[in-house]
Design a protein with these regions (language model features):
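Conserved small/polar residues in nucleotide/adenosyl-binding loops
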Residues: 1-4
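Rossmann-like NAD(P)H-binding beta-loop-alpha module
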Residues: 14, 18-30, 46
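C-terminal substrate-binding/catalytic lobe of Rossmann-fold NAD(P)-dependent oxidoreductases
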Residues: 30-150
């Protein structure tokens, strides 16, 4: 079953697919998965919806026993190999930064997206509106918008 993703930037939607492909390879090779997200100091939710959507996209292709770990501050135990760690940073005027880390033995692979302005969200919204014009009522997401452009 697929989770609907309403993230508007094309880049984030492309990242969903890249992470699914990477998660299949690296999780089975024993890599740990971590997400670190950063936003401005006025943001109320933590972790962000985008961080959760990134985690959800990977969890869709992983074994059912993977779970999210939001806080390790009270734990005194080794990291569970089936956890996806999600950490949130809030400070300054950071528009949005999401980093997904696959940490293995003697190597680390990182995927990172940084939004320098909210314009990337507006561009995606405009493309989505153009796509929806004249479409019958139904459930769509940005994957439909991207597929229509290819």
């Amino acid at each position: 079953s697929s989770t609907l993703k309403f993230e508007l930037p094309y880049s984030i939607n492309t990242l969903f697919k890249l992470l699914q492909d990477a998660a299949k390879v690296f999780a089975s090779a024993g890599f740990d998965i971590e997400i670190v997200e950063k936003h401005h100091n006025q943001k109320l939710d933590a972790p962000s919806g985008t961080a959760l959507a990134l985690a959800d996209s990977m969890k869709e292709v992983l074994e059912d026993d993977y779970f999210y770990r939001y806080d390790r501050s009270q734990l005194r135990q080794k990291r569970d190999p089936k956890e996806i760690g999600i950490s949130a940073v809030r400070g300054g005027t950071i528009v949005g930064e999401h980093e997904v880390i696959f940490a293995g033995e003697d190597e680390v692979i990182e995927f990172k997206h940084t939004a320098h302005s909210k314009a990337v969200f507006a561009k995606g919204a405009v493309e989505a509106a153009k796509f929806l014009a004249g479409k019958p009522a139904g459930m769509y997401d940005m994957r439909d918008v991207i597929a229509a452009k290819n």
